[in-house]
Amino acid sequence: MTSVKTIAMLAMLVIVAALIYMGYRTFTSMQSKLNELESRVNAPQLRPPVMSPIVPLNFIESEDLDKELD
């Protein structure tokens, strides 16, 4: 009976070690992806940001706005 307990204990240790290794790999993978994203965000812009073609409402004259609403 002790050999069964020993085998079960070894199997449990192998499973726990595999889970720890998989967690470590996931953590390091996420860390490298976050570092890559941070370097992309901090990279100098090659071109200026694109301005939106939509004109804000505060630039439209109130008369023009009234005409559009009619």
UniProtKB/Swiss-Prot annotation:
GO terms for cellular component: host cell membrane; membrane. It is a single-pass membrane protein. Its main location: host cell. Keywords: Host membrane, Membrane, Transmembrane, Transmembrane helix. It is found in: Host membrane. The keyword Membrane applies. It comes from the Viruses. The chain crosses the membrane at residues 4-24. This is Uncharacterized protein 011R. The lineage of its organism: Viruses, Varidnaviria, Bamfordvirae, Nucleocytoviricota, Megaviricetes.
